[in-house]
Amino acid sequence: MKLVILLSFVATVAVFAAPSAPAGLEEKLRALQEQLYSLEKENGVDVKQKEQPAAADTFLGFVPQKRMVAWQPMKRSMINEDSRAPLLHAIEARLAEVLRAGERLGVNPEEVLADLRARNQFQ
């Protein structure tokens, strides 16, 4: 019983002994803001620019995006290898033509192939 009375007394003292906000704090803050305003005005600082609030933070936290299916692997086409053969022959014929034209102009075929490889690396 004595312990309960003692604890209630200590709790009461702790509540009433807590520091309170000083009186007139808002008035002091307003006076300091006016003083700052007058100092900025004397120094030539653009006060109107200071009064405008900074740009609002556009990051509003995590916003889920629409689900994209780009992560899914591409399905292999069921194209028959026979249909690719004419395309490969046409490409080989064009390459042979370019190499022959290069030889007629005095360019080494290895240089032409190296140039084509270099161009294809950056694409």
From Swiss-Prot:
Ranges annotated as spanning the membrane: none
Annotated Gene Ontology cellular component terms: cytoplasmic vesicle; extracellular space
Expression by tissue: Expressed in intestinal cells.
Residue numbers covered by the propeptide annotation in the UniProt entry: 30-31, 66-67, 75-76
Disruption outcome: Defecation defects including a distended intestinal lumen, a strong defect in intestinal content expulsion and reduced anterior body wall contraction.
Signal peptide as annotated in the record: 1-17
GO molecular function: neuropeptide receptor binding
Cellular compartments annotated: Secreted; Cytoplasmic vesicle
Protein name stated in the entry: Neuropeptide-like peptides nlp-40
Domain of life: Eukaryota
Keyword tags: Cleavage on pair of basic residues, Cytoplasmic vesicle, Neuropeptide, Secreted, Signal
Organism: Caenorhabditis elegans
Record GO biological process: neuropeptide signaling pathway; positive regulation of defecation
